[in-house]
Design a protein with these regions (language model features):
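Acidic, metal-coordinating catalytic segment for phosphate/diphosphate chemistry
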Residues: 158, 273-354
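A short glycine-rich, hydrophobically flanked beta-strand micro-motif that places a catalytic Asp/Glu
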Residues: 107, 111, 250-253, 300-301
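Short aromatic/hydrophobic contact patches that present stacked aromatics
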Residues: 38, 74, 254, 270, ...
Length: 354
């Protein structure tokens, strides 16, 4: 499932995966690996409807559900055996049967005593497996497994670990906790715990948002400064709109660029005050772009806001180096009120038309 040749793969069937096709892979690369693939356009409304139906089934088992995406979630079934008259394993088996019967969908279940192990177990036997990692079996199960099983250990992290002689959980277990932290920072301390099957994160139905971002892939690679500037402003507006809707602000602005050769370039700047203003987000991202220089052509441009905090902390002191910033902020708030009353196109900036 994916878009045109300049899009990316949303997901792939298991036959395509055998040939090397993966989610988020550029479509042109996927078609080289699997030239006879049938490309299906995404049907987001259908996926959202199915996700909501499955979520309703989950809520009949427990209120403690933490969604990860449309098709994946953590559930905490602690203490529910008496309520349902059956242990969690039985209730989860009934859930997957109900999904097949009512929705025609399969699901993979991973059951364990913490989130890390449940995630590992859910990936063991897709597309419709059921794997359990018991507390007593944790160490023996993990010992010979590769560290790439750890959620978040991608190719770059795996290469760094291999340079340190760490390829398996057994290798991790041989490292002293302080040595791991000294070499890999906070990630090293996390790895020390995960190597022992320890994960104290709770299932949270209201996990805080960590970042807000927007990006676009161009139909054709471009180095046109006006076109890039127009897109950057529109993305800053979208990020700002989402921050305002969530009553959030952020202290870190990130710029993301992907060149024609698919190499990624990312830059970020920390602001003195958190912001939710499109003008501040745009000017910060534009400054990062100017520092990079126009090394295009580019195939992708992105803008993001992170280190999120309540909007009450936003835009407090103004910018002493830019006295006009306060007036621009006031003008933006006024424009927001006009759009709220008359619609999103009631007032536009000229650069948004580029």
């Amino acid at each position: 499932i994916g878009g045109g040749r300049r899009g990316v793969v949303s997901t792939a069937c298991y036959v395509a995966r055998i040939r090397g096709v993966r989610s988020a892979m550029p479509m042109f690369q996927a078609l080289k690996l699997c030239p006879d693939a049938v490309i299906i356009k995404p049907r987001m409304e259908a996926y959202v409807d199915a996700s909501r139906a499955i979520r309703a089934m989950m809520e009949e088992l427990t209120p403690d559900i933490e969604p990860l995406s449309l098709d994946e979630a953590f559930m905490d079934l602690s203490g529910t055996a008496r309520l349902h008259g059956a242990p969690p394993a039985v209730m989860l088996a009934r859930l997957t049967r109900r999904m097949r019967k009512e929705l025609g969908l399969t699901g993979s279940i991973g059951l364990s005593h913490n989130k890390f192990l449940a995630k590992v177990a859910s990936d063991l036997d897709k597309p419709h497996g059921f794997s359990v990692i018991g507390r007593a079996d944790t160490q023996s199960f993990l010992r010979d497994k590769p560290v790439r099983l750890i959620w978040g250990v991608g190719p770059a992290a795996q290469a760094a670990l291999e340079q340190a002689g760490i390829r398996s959980f057994a290798d991790l277990l041989r490292w002293d906790r302080r040595d791991l932290a000294a070499r890999f920072g906070s990630t090293g301390d996390r790895l020390w715990h995960l190597a022992r099957g320890e994960d104290n994160r709770r299932v949270s139905a209201h996990a805080p948002m960590k970042s807000i971002s927007n990006e676009t892939t161009f139909h054709e690679d471009t180095a046109d400064p006006d076109l890039l500037d127009g897109h950057l402003w529109r993305m800053a507006e979208k990020v700002s709109d989402r921050a305002k809707a969530k009553d959030l602000s952020g202290r870190v602005v990130t710029l993301k660029l992907k060149r024609s050769d698919h190499s990624l370039l990312s830059r970020r700047i920390s602001l003195r005050d958190a912001t939710q203003l499109a003008d501040t987000i745009y000017r910060s991202a534009r400054g990062l772009f100017d520092q990079v220089g126009n090394e295009g052509p580019y195939r992708l441009l992105g803008c993001g806001l992170s280190d999120l905090q309540p909007a009450a902390e936003a835009d407090r002191s103004g910018d002493l180096l830019d006295p006009a910033a306060v007036k621009r902020g006031q003008a933006e708030r006024a424009a927001d009120r006009i759009r709220a009353r008359f619609g999103p196109d009631a007032i536009l900036k000229g650069r948004s038309l580029r």
